[in-house]
């Protein structure tokens, strides 16, 4: 969600990174998101001695297009057919107001 709505890497014309710290690189904080219900269903992997396996890598890829497509759908009456990430509040406001 943060990557779709806030996070942006910016370089200047010389290739210098301009968003290299949390001071100028937006990341969502807990207060900015909806409440989440966390459920755990532990299943031990039998293919390695630790019983460990990945837990979130595969699930994060669908979030980006889901958020952006939801915004495009919400703004379709305004003629919006494309929205580049990040869809910051300012970007969405401008699109909603035809700017």
Segments (PLM) and residue ranges:
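C-terminal catalytic domains of large/alpha subunits in multi-subunit enzymes
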Residues: 2-99
């Amino acid at each position: 969600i943060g990557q779709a709505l806030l996070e942006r890497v910016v370089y200047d014309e010389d290739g210098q990174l301009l968003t290299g710290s949390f001071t100028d690189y937006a990341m969502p904080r807990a207060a900015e998101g909806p409440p989440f219900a966390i459920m755990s269903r532990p299943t031990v992997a039998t293919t390695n001695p630790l019983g460990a396996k990945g837990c979130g890598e595969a699930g994060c890829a669908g979030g980006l297009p889901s958020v952006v497509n939801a915004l495009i759908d919400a703004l379709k009456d305004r003629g919006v057919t494309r929205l580049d990430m990040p869809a910051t509040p300012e970007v969405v406001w401008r699109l909603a107001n035809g700017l």
